[in-house]
Design a protein with these regions (language model features):
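Multi-pass membrane glycosyltransferase architecture that uses lipid-linked
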Residues: 2-284, 322-522
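Periplasmic/ER-lumenal interhelical loops and adjacent helix-loop junctions
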Residues: 277-323
């Protein structure tokens, strides 16, 4: 087999044609490109401009984030502070300015250590998010009226969250090396721009995206550390370790999983242990609040409660939601082990977080941020992504119109309860639709947009192209579960020859795999 040239010795103009161009692979992307001059031509000279995919996508992400800030302008200019329902009718609500005073930052109270007046008692956020909030309060001017300080606090947080948004877009762009332009889906996602400054979720999403990038680069310890930090900012990221465990089981990569798990545990403890030891009541508030919180906005449980004469108690919902989540975890594990070809890491990460969102007793509109980067990596198909985003934007508008209805008194300006139930249903169906498409790709790998272009698992790191060692079901009996690649599976270098090896730029067809001899086979 001809030696593969290194990245250092290969000009960009030679490497670039191996990149996947969305305007050639995706009909919706091609149609959308007409707004900026049409699809890229076959003879386009690539790799010679300052405008690399990473730079373009980072700037687009900043631009879309700025549009999201403009959308919040009516609230910034007064709706957060005057009128019971105006912040909802303008669909520009944010927790950030309200919690500046409501959680004691205006009074310089120390999160977790100083008790708050009222029923909440302590800050109800994980430690790293509390640190983020506290740092923003240090950067906020302490002079002027409370309204002026809250405006400053929101702006400071918006600047910090914009950095997180760029990190997310760049990490997604760099995770699938041959598909950098998939990052545009993150940068252009309307639900991302609309919900980015509602709360502090982008911190955890940025750390999770960076963790996935590190795993794709075969750095399990760095992955674990970043995932541990993400879990210290929000609870959901630790769920990704579940499907990763099953994938490493199927591929026999226990050592790498152990490193990742150890790094995550150490990072989480470094952040949490000091607060646990010296302010346990404040530290535990997030967990007790999550457990004691009743059925809330956005979940199918709320529809059930609103339409039942004898609604279930919070304890019952907690138990049932946990059981449903465990069933989903079992189903995802079984799917991983019986799939004809080992699922990609991003596919399972998306499914496990989507399962948590669908079964949880609350769905705040900013939770869509958890799924956006994972959805792009799991199924980078513009049509399906935009269908899901349309559903999420509909829910975003629905919840604010419902709150406008409930807070406008006898005027009842907004969306009544039945209409809000339909909005919840749209959100649930949109998320389920994307889940079904991902599951179909797992069961029918030739339908997977990533694998159609010759990749195996570009976000999988050590799993990319690895042989299977434990498989269940028909795949184990037929021996069709192995998808081994000799060397890096993403690029086919070398001149064509009589023995059938690949020529430069030649691509393996859908459903084929590369054997140890470099030949294509079924």
């Amino acid at each position: 087999m001809c030696p593969m040239p290194s990245a250092e010795s290969t000009p960009a103009s030679v490497r670039e044609p191996d990149s996947v161009r969305p305007t050639r692979e995706d009909a919706v992307a091609a149609a959308g490109s007409e707004l900026i001059g049409g699809p890229l031509g076959r003879r386009a000279l690539l790799g010679t401009s300052w405008w690399t995919p990473v730079r373009v996508i980072a700037l687009v992400a900043i631009g879309m984030f700025a549009l999201g800030l403009v959308q919040k302008a009516p609230c910034y200019n007064g709706a957060w502070f005057f009128g019971a329902s105006s912040q909802y009718t303008h669909a520009c609500y944010s927790d950030i300015p309200h919690l500046y005073q409501g959680r004691g930052f205006v009074d310089d109270l120390v999160p977790y250590f100083d008790k708050l007046p009222g029923d909440m008692e302590y800050l109800e956020y994980p430690v790293l998010t509390g640190v983020f909030m506290e740092v923003a309060s240090w950067l906020t001017t302490g002079s002027g009226s409370i309204q002026h300080q809250e405006q400053w606090y929101w702006m400071v947080n918006a600047g910090m969250l914009m950095v997180c948004a760029v990190v997310i877009a760049v990490c997604v762009t760099r995770t699938h090396a041959r598909r950098p332009w998939d990052g545009l889906l993150v940068a252009l996602a309307p639900a991302f721009a609309l919900t980015a400054t509602i709360n502090w979720d982008l911190l955890a999403v940025a750390l999770t995206s960076a963790a996935v990038l590190m795993w794709s680069r075969m750095r399990p310890v760095a992955f674990g550390v970043l995932l541990g930090l993400a879990t210290a900012a929000k609870l959901y990221p630790f769920l990704i370790l579940g499907p990763l465990l099953v994938l490493c089981w199927r591929a026999g990569r226990w050592r790498e999983f152990g490193k990742a798990l150890g790094g995550a545990a150490v990072a989480w403890l470094v952040v949490n242990l000091p607060v646990m030891l010296f302010a346990f009541d404040g530290w535990s508030k997030f967990y007790t609040f999550s457990q004691e919180r009743g059925v809330d906005f956005g979940s199918f449980w709320l529809i059930l409660v609103h339409n039942t004469d004898n609604p279930p108690s919070t304890e019952t919902v907690n138990t049932l939601a946990t059981l449903l989540m465990l069933l989903c975890c079992g189903a995802i594990a079984a799917l991983t082990l019986i799939a004809p070809r080992r699922p990609r890491f991003a596919q399972l990460a998306f499914l496990i977080i989507a399962a948590f969102i669908l079964t949880n007793k609350v769905y705040s509109p900013q939770y869509v941020l958890w799924l956006v980067p994972l959805a792009v990596l799991a199924r980078p198909k513009w049509r399906d992504f935009l269908i899901w985003q349309a559903c999420e934007v509909a829910y975003f508008l629905g919840i604010w119109m419902y709150l406008a209805y409930t807070t406008s008194g006898d005027a009842h300006k907004g969306l009544p309860t039945d209409g809000y139930h339909w909005a919840i249903g749209v959100h649930l169906l949109g998320t389920l639709f994307l889940c079904v498409m991902v599951v179909r790709d797992i069961l029918m790998p030739d339908r997977d947009p990533v694998r159609q272009t010759g990749d195996d698992d570009p976000s999988g790191g050590v799993l990319d192209g690895a042989r299977d060692v434990f498989v269940l079901g028909p795949a184990a009996r037929t021996g069709q579960h192995s998808a081994h690649f000799e060397g890096p599976p993403l690029v086919r270098w070398g001149a064509g020859s009589a023995d059938g090896r690949f020529a430069l730029g030649e691509r393996v067809g859908a459903g084929e795999r590369v054997g140890a001899d470099g030949r294509a086979g079924r």
